[in-house]
């Protein structure tokens, strides 16, 4: 019971404390409910005519002293059956799950994908796309896009950037390489070194794929696309490897050296607005560009497929006000159209 002589400051403090306590209680209730929810997260199903296979390979680049874990999504033979791939398998998946807040660890491990583990590949030849993730991410975080593209006939090489993927990359023999926590992207020289390393990884993956007898691929070049820093690298890669004939950037800013204009087709898709550094190539017609006013940065990843079950506001997770699965389908459609469609021969 407050009396007339109670200081206003005390009343205000009590009121604010009560509001804070209620907010904390509501927040805890949401988190508890979310963590007790055992429903698995099911990613959107691919829409194309082909079943999708996936293999995970450990490739060593002796020339550059690099080792890479590469996710390969591809069209499988008609009628292919078998166990589904794990979203991120084994110890790597467990390590990733421990650090993927606010998603409870067991929920990340139970994400349901459509690709069949180690399924026999269709006879091909298949057009090839390189997929580069955002900084700190791994290609599996873009499974929805990769599976949809593969179901329409593309072979998608998701290259994990060793030393940049966080918290770590776990290799087939169990050893791990931790990712740099604070890459110096504001230093143009340091950023350019990363651009060259990631682009070198993409080129090596193309070299190594050509020696993999499981896949028959088209020889007339490859496309490359990525999200965030991976999208930035994709555009740079056009000038670094003549085999890359087209590149798409999903909401990535420009880092490293100024972009070299090669005359090769580019596509730039941004959340909310076109970044200032891309306005010149967009205006000149050097790049095909589009912005999505209601989308945020992480809507270009699988995170868009399950934001409604997060117990915190989507904006805090860099997620916008879009229908996540529908948005990803639209991005996949744009990628497929830009890279020319795919028909197995």
Where are these regions (language model features)?
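Short, solvent-exposed beta-strand-terminating loops
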Residues: 75-92, 159-172, 287-309
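Short substrate-entry loop that stabilizes the transition state in hydrolases
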Residues: 111-126, 131-169, 274-275
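Primarily recognizes the serine-hydrolase "nucleophile elbow" in alpha/beta-hydrolase
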Residues: 204-262
């Amino acid at each position: 019971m407050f009396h007339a002589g109670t200081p206003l400051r005390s009343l205000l403090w009590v009121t604010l404390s009560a509001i804070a306590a209620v907010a904390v209680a509501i927040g805890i209730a949401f988190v508890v409910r979310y963590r007790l929810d055992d429903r698995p997260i099911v990613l959107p199903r691919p829409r194309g005519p082909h079943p999708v296979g996936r293999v995970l390979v450990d490739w060593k680049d002796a020339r550059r002293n690099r080792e890479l874990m590469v996710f390969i999504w591809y069209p499988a033979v008609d009628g292919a059956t078998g166990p589904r791939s794990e979203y991120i398998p084994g110890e790597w998946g467990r390590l990733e799950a421990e650090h993927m807040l606010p998603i409870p660890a067991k929920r990340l491990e139970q994400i349901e994908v459509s690709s069949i583990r180690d399924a026999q590949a269709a006879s091909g030849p298949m057009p090839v796309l390189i997929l580069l993730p955002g900084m700190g991410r791994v290609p599996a975080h873009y499974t929805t896009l990769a599976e949809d593209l593969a179901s329409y006939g593309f072979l998608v090489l998701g290259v994990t950037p060793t030393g940049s993927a966080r918290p770590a990359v776990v290799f087939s023999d169990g050893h791990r390489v931790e990712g740099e926590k604070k890459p110096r992207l504001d230093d143009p020289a340091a950023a350019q070194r990363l651009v060259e390393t990631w682009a070198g990884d993409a080129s090596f993956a193309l070299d190594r794929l050509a020696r993999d007898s499981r896949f028959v691929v088209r020889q007339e070049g490859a496309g490359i696309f990525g999200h965030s820093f991976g999208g930035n690298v994709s555009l740079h890669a056009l000038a670094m490897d003549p085999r890359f004939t087209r590149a798409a950037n999903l909401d990535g800013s420009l880092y490293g050296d100024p972009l070299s204009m090669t005359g090769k087709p580019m596509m730039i898709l941004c959340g909310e607005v076109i970044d200032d550094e891309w306005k010149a190539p967009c205006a000149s017609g050097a790049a095909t560009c589009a912005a999505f006013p209601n989308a945020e940065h992480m809507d270009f990843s699988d995170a868009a497929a399950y934001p409604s079950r997060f117990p915190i506001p989507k904006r805090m997770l860099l997620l916008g006000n879009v229908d996540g699965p529908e948005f990803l389908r639209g991005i996949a459609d744009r990628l497929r159209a830009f890279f020319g469609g795919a028909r197995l021969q």
